[in-house]
A protein has these predicted regions:
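Structural signal for short hydrophobic segments within the conserved structured cores
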Residues: 25, 73, 104-106
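Thiol-based oxidoreductase modules, predominantly thioredoxin-like and allied folds used
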Residues: 47, 69-83
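N-terminal leader/targeting and pre-domain segments
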Residues: 1-42, 125-132
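Short alpha-helical
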Residues: 53, 79-82, 111
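Local sequence-structure signature of Cys/Sec-based thiol-disulfide redox active-site neighborhoods
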Residues: 32-64
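Non-catalytic, surface beta->alpha helical segment in thiol-disulfide oxidoreductase systems
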Residues: 97-132
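Short amphipathic alpha-helix with an adjacent loop that forms part of the alpha/beta core around
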Residues: 35, 85-87
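Structural micro-motif
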Residues: 87-96
Length: 132
């Protein structure tokens, strides 16, 4: 079976499939609570912004890392002020862990597979809380 060709950012033909190893979702003020409560497994919730260089790096790198998660949930901090306030986001990118609709807090770590997986394991050993 032949895969369809696509183009890269310079419009050159490419048959490379996205390197993402996890499901990715975009969440908003309007649907984040409902969707996070309904999702089973581990979700890494990441607040980003268009003008943030570290956020662009996170968007590029995180989908391809071998992380112990089921999905990445992206939230644009500039467009979703209600979530930014409720999650008390003060820096970007900001990472949080949700498992089976329960909140396990923030992650403060480097954006590498080893560091993130260690921080995820530590976070998931905390007592779960309700979503903010």
């Amino acid at each position: 079976m032949k895969r369809p060709m696509s183009t890269d950012s310079l419009c050159r033909p490419s048959d490379i499939v996205s390197p993402s190893i996890v499901v990715e979702s975009e969440l908003t003020d309007f649907d984040a609570d409902q969707r996070l409560l309904a999702m089973s497994g581990v979700s890494l919730v990441i607040f980003t912004s268009v003008g943030c260089a570290s956020c662009r790096y996170a968007r590029q790198v995180l989908p391809g890392l071998p992380l112990a998660i089921d999905r990445l949930c992206w939230i644009d901090a500039g467009d979703n002020g209600g979530l930014v306030e409720r999650y008390q986001v003060f820096h970007l990118p900001a990472l949080f862990v949700v498992r089976d609709g329960e909140f396990f807090g923030a992650l403060h770590t480097r954006l590498t597979a080893d560091a993130l997986n260690a921080a995820l394991a530590q976070a998931l050993n905390r007592t779960a809380e309700e979503l903010p």
